[in-house]
Amino acid sequence: MSDVELVKKMLRAVLQSSKHGVAMARLQGDYRALTGEMIPFRKFGHDTLESFLRSIPGVVRLERSITGEVMCFAGVCEETAHIAQLVARQKNVKKTGCSKLLNFQMRARTSHLFSHNVKPRLSLRQPSNMTHPGRGSVTSFYSTQRKLYSNDLPSSRAPAWQMNRKSPVPEKTSVVPSKINTNIKTPLKKTSGTAAQQKPVNRADVELVQGRIKQLLQKYSSGVWLSKIPQLYKSMFQEELHIIQEVEKWTHICTVEKPGSNNIVDRLVYPVLEPVPKASPVPVKSPCKQSPNTALLKQPTLTQKTTRTFRTLAINIPQSTPKPQTPLSPTSPNSTMIDFTLSETPKTQSLSPITPPSTPPAHQPLTTELKQKLRQLLNKYSQGLWAHGLPQLFQEAFGCAFPQYVLEDLSLLADTCMVEYPMPDNRKRAILYTLPCQVQTQPRSRPPPLVLPCTSNPHVPPLIIPTADFHSVFVIEINSTNNVVVRFAGGGYSKSLEVMEEEMQNFYNNIGAGLCLLSPKIGQLVAVASSDGAMLRAQVHQLSEDKVKVYFLDHGFFDLVSRKTLFQLRDQFMTLPFQATTCQLAGLEPFSTDPVVLKTLQSLAVGRSLLAEIVEREDTPLVVLYDTSENDDVNVTAMCLKALQDKSMENPLQVNSVYTNVCVTNVCSDGSVYCQLPSRGQAKLKDIMDKIEAHFISQLTWELLVSRPFCGKVCLAKYKGKWARAEIINLHGSHVLDILFLDLGLPASLEVSELREIPPIFLKELITIPPQAIKCLLEDLNVDRAVWPPEAVLWLRETVHNKAPSCMKIVKLDETRTVHIYLFCGNEAQDIHDSVNRQLASCPFWKQDVYANKINKASELFLPDAGEPSGSSPAPSNALTLPPQLNLPLVGQNMDVFVSVACHPGHFVLQPWQDLYKLVVLMGEMVLFYNKQEVTTVDIQKNNVYAAKIDNNWHRVLVKGLLTNGLVSVYELDYGKYELINYTQLQPLIEEFRQLPFQGISAQLADVKKEVWCEEASMVFRNHVEKKPLVAQIESVEEGEWPWERKISVYLVDTTQENKDIWIHNIMKEFLDEISRDA
C-alpha cells in the first residue's frame, strides 16, 4: 500500500468515520487498524507526517484545537465539473454548432460492472515486434471468446493478418528488434495457434494431408471450426499442418461455410456428403442438421488411430463425472480439446477420472420435433441458455416434457446446439448456444428512412452502430417511440463531423464560392450555408419559387432556406456517413404514439445529451436512454411507464391518519418496510393477476418468453408460485438479473429464463396500476446507520412480515414522499408505547453498540505478534481451501489481459482477457446464491477470504481491516480494488465459488523505474491502459505465499489501432524525459 492514491483513499476513510476529527497523534494508529500498515510518508519524499498531510489538502484539513492539539479532518472531495451546464446549453440547439457540443461522453452507468451482451470474440492481435531479442510470443490463438468489458471499452480490431487473409489461420513471422540495432530482425518461434513457416510440398504430401483431413472430418461429421483443425490434426497424426490455407480449395474433401452471425469470423468445415447405403435415413440436406449417427456408417481406414476427443475445460474437473459423453460438434472453439489415444484391443481401459466414456447410452434418438423446439428456444435466448432450465421451459412453453437422459448426456444435442461448460468444477452446469448456421432473427418494424432514395446521388457509406453497449447520444426529435432521431457523440461521429464541417466552411468560402446550385432537384444532396456562416449537408425535399425545404442530414431536422444558400455538394464531403439516424425505445413499443409518453419524452429527452444502452443492433437499433447528468441515473423508459400510471388508484396518504388491514410485504436491511394498503388499485390488480394466472394455465407461453432483458422493463416473475409484476433493475452478464417485485417492494435475483412478458391483452391495463407497495420508515428508529444489525432485521421480519393484518399511523411525510409511521400488530391503533417501534427499541440487541462489539471481538486478530513484521501477512484461517493458483505464461511470453485498475506504472491490476466470461458466470452464480440467503452474522477475521456485496454485485474479497463505525476494508481478489463496506455485507465464501483462480494479478510496468509517481504521470498512464484490453509480455514473476501476493513485471502493448503497436513503457519514458527537461 505504498501507492499514494491508495493511501489517500484509506486516509479519507479514516477521517470520514469521525465527524469531530482525529488527533494527529492518533492518526497512525487508526490508519494501521484499517490497513495493517503505517502511513508511508517517507516514501513520498516527506520527513514528517504533518508535512505529508499538508501536501494533500484535498484529503486532509489540519486545524488546532483549543488545547493546541493538531486535529485532522476530512477535506472536501470536489467532484469533476458537472456536465449539467453543457446539457443546458444544448436544450434548444438544433442548427449549427451542435457537433461541437457533443464532443464528450456521458457518465457511464455505475451499476453495470460489465457488458451483459456476451458475444464470440477473437484473441487480441499480438504485437509484431517484441522487446527482447530471442523471445517469442506463445500466446494461444482462441478462435472465439466471450467478451466482457466495461462501458467505455474500445473495440479491439482483428489481428492485422486477418484483414487480407484467405485462411483463418495466419501465415506470419514475428520479428524482434535488437537492443543495439533496431533494423536487425530475428525470426521468432511459432506459437501453437499460428501456422508454421511455409515450406514447399509435393503432390504426395498433399494427397497424404487430404486423406488425413478426410479422416479427421469423418470423426467430426457435424462440423468443426477451421481454426481448430491444425490442433486436432497434430493431436491425431503427431505432425504439424503446414497448408491449412489450402483446405478451403479442397471441395472434393470438405465444405467450408461462413457462419451467418456477423460476430464470428471463423468458418465451419464439414465433410463432403458421400453416398450412403439404402438402409440409411433420408439424406440430410443441410450440414447444420446432419445427424451425428452419420459418422458411424463410415468405417475408419487402417491408418486411422482410435482417438477419443472430449470437450472439457482445463481446470479441476471433478472426479464425480464419469458420465458417457461423445464429442460435441461442431467443436466449440473456446473449449480446450484433450485427446486420449486408446488401444484397439477389446479389453477394458482405465480412463482418466476427468474423462467420461465415449460410448453413449442406448437411448432412443431425439425426435425432429424436439430438436426444432430446442432451436426455437435457443433462437429466443441468443445469449445462451442454461441446460438445467430446459425441463421447466419445455413444460411451460410447449406443454411437453424434456427427456431427462438428454441432460445427463448433452452430446446427444451435438447437431442441434453448441454446449459450453463455463464452471470448470461443475459438469452439470452447461450453457447451450444455437449453432451459427441456425440463427434466426425476427425483423422489427422500421420507421421510414430519413434520406429520400435518389439514383443520381453518389454513394455515401452507411452509419455504423457503435460496438460498445453504452454510447452517448444527442436526442434531436421524437415523433414516436419507434422513430427517435439521434446523433452519436464522440470519436468517429460528432468529432469527425466537426472536422468535416470546418473543411466545408473553408472550401466554400474560398475555392467553392462559385459552386452555387441554380436548379436543385428533389432528392439531390446539397451544401447549405447557414445564417452564421456554417456549411451543412442537406437533401432537397420540396421546391417553391424562392424557398427550398431541405432536410439537414447530420442534424436531423427540416427547414425552409433560400435558393441562394444552396451549393453543390462535392464528393470529398460524402465520405463521412450521415450522422442523424433513427432508433427505437425499448419497452415502449405498445405506447409508441401515446400523448402522455410523448410529452414525457419531450421534457426528459428531446434536445438533451443522454446515455444510450444498445439492446439490439440493427439498422434501426433498439435502445434504452438514461440521463446520467445527476448523481442518480434516470431511466427514461421507466419514467415514461410511470407517467402512464393512474394516480386515482393510489390510497391517499395523510399525516396523523390511521390505516388498517395493512400487509407488510418486505423488511429491508436498512430497517425500511414496504406495506400494502387497501386501495382501488389493489382490487383491480388482484382481478387482472387472476386472469393472467388463468391465461398461463390455459395457453402455451412460447411467445411470452423474455429474450431481450434491459433495465426498466416491466414483466412477470413468480413469487411463491404465482405470477407477479416485476421490474428489471440490474443485469449480471447475460443470464442473471435483479428484479423488484413492484407490488411487494421485494428485490430478487433470478435467471432470465424465469421471466415472462405481460400478455398483450392485459398490458396497457396493468401498466396503469401504480405499484402497491409503499416504502415506510419506522419513527424513532431512524438511527445514523446505513444498515441495521442483522438481529434487528430478523426480529422485525418475524414480527410483522406477511403476518396477520397490521395497523399503521402516519406521523410524517418528508419531501421525498417517504412515509414515517408507527406500526402496530393487529388491526387497531393502540398506544404508541405498544407499537412495534417501541418494542424493537427496547430490545437488548438494539441498545448495545453492535459495531463496538464487532471490533472488540476481532481486535485481537488485528494486532501482530511481538516479533512479527508489520508488513507480514498472516495465514488465512478459513477451513475451506483456496482456489488454485492462476496459470501464467513463461517469462518472455505474451498473454491477453484486461487492466481493471491502474494507479500508476508501479501498481496496476490485470485480468486474463480470455477467462473474463468465466468470471462473469461465477459472479452471476454468486448473485443467485447469496441474494436468496437470509441475513446471517459472520465472524469476520482479518486476512480471510469472504463473499462481499459491492454495488449490487457479489465479489470474492480479502478482509484487510475494520473501522470502529462498522465499515470493513476489503480487497477485491478478482478486480484488484480496495473498498469500504458495511460488515453486514460479508458472507462466507462457499466451496463452489473457490474453484476458479482469483483473476486479479498485481503488476508493474517493466523497464520504467521510479520510486514516486507524480499525479500527471499517473493520469497519463491511466488514460492509456485502464479499462482496456492489452497484450502483456511477462518480464518477471515475483511469487508470494498467497495468490494475492504474487506480482509480475510486464511490458504492455496496445494493439487496438490499425497497423500500429503502442508500447506503454515507451510513452512513459518519453513523458518522464519531458518532465525532466521542463524541470
Curated annotation (Swiss-Prot):
Keyword set, alphabetical order: Cytoplasm, Differentiation, Repeat, RNA-binding, Spermatogenesis
Gene Ontology MF: a single term: mRNA binding
InterPro entries for this protein: LOTUS-like, OST-HTH/LOTUS_dom, SNase_OB-fold_sf, TDRD7_LOTUS_3, Tudor, Tudor_domain_containing, Tudor_TDRD7_rpt2, Tudor_TDRD7_rpt3
Protein name per the record: Tudor domain-containing protein 7A
Induction, as annotated: Down-regulated by miR-430 in somatic cells. Down-regulation is relieved by dnd that acts by protecting the 3'-UTR of tdrd7 from miR-430-mediated RNA deadenylation.
Organism: Danio rerio
Repeat among keywords: yes
SUPFAM superfamilies to which the protein is assigned, alphabetical: Tudor/PWWP/MBT
UniProt feature coiled coil, ranges: none
GO cellular component annotations of the record: P granule; ribonucleoprotein granule
